[in-house]
């Protein structure tokens, strides 16, 4: 179901003030503020101030057809990726292998504005669309691979279901297997949630058959999905080809299901993931990416015991010598990210903005605490935390 604010005459001070202080700003105003900041030299200054920070960029898959119209962060076009890498090279961002970058970061010997490119999940388009571009541009890339769907050759269920509902032409649907009838004009999210839960309990072969039934009910061609091999991860042969081409393949859990507090499940996910990939990859499997960015600081010890040396998040920001190797920040790139926003992240301007916003928030908290403490005798003393950059 394919179910900006213009402001004239804003001064530069007003634009930057809005940008730094407001919790939510319309995208056109943000971009206007970024263009203004660049023209005033703030991008250049930010790059100098943050040059010792490691930039790690996060991509996911490549569109093999028109999936980018559905989720343009999950599936980027090949030309989009090419232009990004060409920008990095043109602007002098050295692109390093993950292992080399982390080793240099640990001893504070990174080249200025060092950059790492990572890709999550192991989507088929990384091999069919991305690899030729990676080879042509001669860049190191790390691909974090989740292995359940490598082993079970069906489309990724959660993403396929979401796509089918996005494509649905019908306004009302009677879902298969007695799940229920829904008015998609008002209940699409509820219907999709029910279907996601239902399919999670099915074995792979039955899950595939249910996807066909669901597509028919929603009046979407499943033949197109199967014919173009949409929403599939790489198979073993493609992963071997990726590894043979020098791509760094690393850990991303087996089922892409990551608990916060179940240590045994964490161990199982890493062990199964590593055991499967060891049949394909000769280099050590010791770097990890948290599925969907779910993690807790307490998991660092768990991962270290499992022989993992680093773990990436989807928290925005740069990485310095004092950044935990188990909470590495990344810049998530994709179709919705404009050129000026990408430049703002890469130069470190947005890093400085986030630091300033944290500082302003801490100041407001301190003032509020001071106000309560000065409200009269007998009031309890409230602790105030300090904000850091």
PLM features: what roles do these ranges have?
Residues 14-118, 125, 153-174, 244, ...:
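C-terminal active-site subregion of NodB/CE4 polysaccharide deacetylases
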Residues 47-54, 153-245:
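Extended, charge-rich helix/loop segments that form flexible
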Residues 110-111, 123, 132-144, 196-222, ...:
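CE4/NodB-like, metal-dependent polysaccharide N-deacetylase domain
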Residues 119, 123-160:
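Long, hydrophobic, well-ordered secondary-structure blocks that form the structural core
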Residues 129-133, 238, 299-302:
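A short acidic, amphipathic alpha-helical/loop segment
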């Amino acid at each position: 179901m394919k179910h900006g604010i213009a402001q004239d005459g804003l001064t530069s001070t007003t634009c930057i003030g809005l940008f730094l202080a407001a919790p939510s700003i319309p995208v056109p105003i943000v971009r206007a503020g970024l263009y203004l900041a660049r023209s005033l030299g703030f991008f250049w200054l930010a790059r100098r101030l943050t040059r010792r920070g490691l930039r790690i960029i996060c991509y996911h898959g490549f569109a093999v057809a028109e999936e980018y119209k559905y989720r343009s962060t999950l599936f980027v076009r090949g030309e989009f990726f090419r232009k990004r890498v060409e920008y990095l090279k043109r602007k002098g961002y050295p692109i390093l292998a993950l292992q080399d970058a982390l080793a240099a970061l640990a001893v504070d010997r990174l080249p200025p504005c060092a950059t790492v490119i990572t890709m999550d999940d192991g989507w088929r388009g990384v091999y069919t669309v991305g690899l030729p571009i990676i080879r042509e541009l001669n860049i190191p890339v790390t691909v974090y691979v989740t292995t359940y769907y490598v082993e079970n050759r069906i489309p990724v269920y959660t993403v396929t279901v979401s796509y089918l509902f996005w494509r649905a032409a019908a306004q009302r649907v009677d879902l298969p297997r007695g799940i229920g009838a829904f008015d998609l004009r008002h209940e699409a999210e509820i219907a999709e949630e029910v279907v996601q839960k239902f399919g999670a309990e099915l074995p792979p072969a039955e899950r595939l058959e249910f996807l066909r039934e669901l597509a028919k009910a929603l009046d979407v061609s499943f033949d197109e999905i199967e014919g173009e091999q949409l929403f599939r991860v790489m198979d073993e042969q493609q992963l071997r080809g990726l590894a043979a081409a020098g791509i760094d393949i690393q850990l991303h859990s087996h089922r892409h299901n990551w608990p916060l507090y179940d240590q045994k499940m964490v161990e199982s996910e890493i062990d199964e993931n590593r055991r499967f990939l060891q049949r394909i990859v000769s280099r050590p499997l010791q770097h990890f990416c948290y599925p969907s960015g779910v993690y807790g600081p307490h998991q660092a010890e768990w991962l270290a015991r499992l022989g993992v040396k680093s773990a990436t998040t989807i928290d925005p920001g740069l990485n310095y010598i004092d950044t935990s190797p188990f909470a590495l920040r990344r810049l998530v790139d994709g179709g919705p990210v404009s050129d000026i926003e990408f430049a703002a992240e890469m130069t470190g301007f947005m890093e400085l903005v986030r630091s300033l916003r944290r500082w302003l928030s801490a100041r407001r908290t301190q003032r509020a605490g001071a106000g309560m403490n000065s409200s009269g005798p007998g009031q309890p003393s409230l602790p105030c935390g300090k904000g850091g950059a």
